[in-house]
Amino acid sequence: MEISILTDVGQRRTNNQDYANQYKNKAGKSMIFLADGMGGHRAGNIASEMAVTDLGAAWVATEISTINEVREWFAEYLEKENQQIHRIGQDEEHKGMGTTLEAVAIIDDQVLFAHVGDSRIGLVRNGEYHQLTSDHSLVNALLKAGQITEEEAAHHPQRNIITQSIGQKDELQPDFGMVTVEAGDFIVINSDGLTNMISGDEIRDIVVSDLSVEEKAKTLVRFANNAGGLDNITVVLIHFAEEDVA
């Protein structure tokens, strides 16, 4: 398994509120977290880094090696982190603090994920890009209800409003999903700074190119910057080879 994690401030922002990292537990199983923070001053930076590092430290301490154990772990620890960030967000200096979260566990040839907010997870298989997550956003809710079109959604003035985040008062309702990976598959995890700037077709074209995994990640970020780079851009690209899925 090859993995590249890349984050970039983009063209317009002065600080980077995205955070991503990979952790291995005592059973040697990998979990990748990506978070896109929000909140004034430095609250967004703190929320994203805290969610990833807290959950990463909790994962490292486990000996989890089965899908069912991952499910139970997600159910307990995502809500714990939600409450912790919500508590800190009550301080004046951390007001409005919260973060999206993508958590991706790799158990042999099974990829189990949890999704909160409008960062995304995608699968590139046989030359096609498939979005595996559905944005927890106001615009996506309007789109699903048939109140706006895809075209209107892309330029909607409230497209940055998310309906779920780590740090909210209410109990989290994450989406969970699982995919059995095949040799040659790529998993793409990204903040909205990528997918607000480039299309799924562009992501697919870069991912299926002959570049190395690291160069593919760099190219994705470069394309997003060339398209305007309106937000921080974070990409995690994972490639599964024959020996990873045998």
Residue ranges and their predicted role:
Residues 1-246:
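PP2C/PPM-type serine/threonine phosphatase catalytic domain
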